[in-house]
A protein has these predicted regions:
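Loop-helix junctions at membrane interfaces
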Residues: 1-159
Length: 159
């Protein structure tokens, strides 16, 4: 149901790319947007995917400057919330012109702006983003031990 498109783990690749480098994060985020476009998804979904470049770039630059962020549960959750908020805000900004331009289904207007856009898209994206971030960390922790990368960002809660 557009503009919502919550698919569990759909942001995992972007988060793992953020753990690697800013360039990797931007290319993965842009690539997913191109993928949605080529797959024929509605334009609102494509632009929402393109907005991922913002949180991916910001988050990966922060991780590059603060590589210890992922080493404690508390700091990683604060980071997850911050990137989730940026992610949600970007997606709400993308959806608003479609909503106010009367380009949504009647069900969205029946629910109203607060429920349809702010809660469903905004808050829903923050929660979805944080779940996917947790999944990405769970995958990244063993992978980062097995694979040598130019920039090391590790997840180590027991250090």
């Amino acid at each position: 149901m557009e503009p919502a498109s919550f698919t569990l783990a759909s942001h995992v690749a972007i988060f793992i790319a953020m753990f690697i480098s800013p360039a990797t994060a931007v290319f993965v985020a842009a690539g997913t947007a191109v993928g949605f476009l080529l797959a024929g998804f509605p334009i609102v979904i494509v632009i929402r995917a393109a907005s991922h470049v913002v949180f991916a770039a910001a988050g990966s630059v922060y991780l590059k400057k603060h590589p210890d962020t992922l080493k404690t549960f508390k700091s990683s959750q604060v980071f997850s919330l911050a990137t989730g908020l940026l992610h949600g805000i970007c997606e709400v900004i993308v959806v608003m012109p479609f909503y106010f331009g009367n380009n949504m289904s009647s069900a969205y207007y029946a629910k109203g702006f607060i429920v349809s856009v702010v809660l469903l898209v905004g808050v829903g994206t923050v929660v979805h983003s944080m779940i996917d971030f947790y999944l990405a960390q769970a995958i990244w922790k063993p992978v980062s031990k097995a694979v040598k990368l130019p920039e090391k960002v590790s997840v180590n809660y027991n250090a």
